[in-house]
Amino acid sequence: MIKWEEASVIEIPKDVKVGLSGTMLSMTFGNKKLEKKFADNYVRLLVEDNKIKIVKSKNNSRERGIVGTWASEISNMVKGLKEGFQYEMKIDYSHFPMRVSVKGKTVVIENFFGERSPRTAEIVGETQVSVKGDRLFLNGPSKKDVGETAANIERATIIKGFDPRVFQDGIYLISKGE
């Protein structure tokens, strides 16, 4: 018989609805919904009232690491539903003015270093991207999706074969505004 011991307890606000179906944890607040799979053989989730308990059957460094990671991810899900995450990026160029626009689920970067073909970056999940002057604002309930979208935009403006200390054109993350 496996003995499960309680490793961590996360308090959930009363207005956030929590559901656990197998290993899939879903949270709903208003019209926002987040789902994440938490699967492991030695660490499990239990939902009781307005608490999520993380229990483990082994006590070694791997399981302690998983417990801490899961606790952080669950608290980020709650924070994302209640407040959201906002990142700010700056459009930086020296000679050729970049035109940045949002078309559907992609960010289109035109006239980067005078290139004729536009560069594109994918918008991940429910992330909202808006362009105001030389700033890009990324908002969304999932920290992972907002961060991945910011990385996609920054990666789309990498210049291969040039010294980045000299050629500093690009779109860079300046604030995580958490």
Curated annotation (Swiss-Prot):
Top-rank taxon, per record: Archaea
Keywords associated with the record: Ribonucleoprotein, Ribosomal protein, RNA-binding, rRNA-binding
One Gene Ontology term of the molecular function aspect: rRNA binding
GO cellular component terms listed in the entry, alphabetical order: cytosolic large ribosomal subunit
GO BP: any one term: cytoplasmic translation
Pfam families for the chain: Ribosomal_L6
Protein's UniProt keywords contain Lyase: no
Transmembrane segments: none
Cited InterPro entries: Ribosomal_uL6-like (IPR000702), Ribosomal_uL6-like_a/b-dom_sf (IPR036789), Ribosomal_uL6_a/b-dom (IPR020040), Ribosomal_uL6_arc (IPR019907)
Gene3D superfamilies (UniProt xref): Ribosomal protein L6, alpha-beta domain (3.90.930.12)
Family recorded in the similarity comment: Belongs to the universal ribosomal protein uL6 family.
Known partners and oligomeric status: Part of the 50S ribosomal subunit.
Function: This protein binds to the 23S rRNA, and is important in its secondary structure. It is located near the subunit interface in the base of the L7/L12 stalk, and near the tRNA binding site of the peptidyltransferase center.
PANTHER family for this protein: 60S RIBOSOMAL PROTEIN L9, 60S/50S RIBOSOMAL PROTEIN L6/L9
Protein name: Large ribosomal subunit protein uL6
Organism of derivation: Thermoplasma volcanium (strain ATCC 51530 / DSM 4299 / JCM 9571 / NBRC 15438 / GSS1)
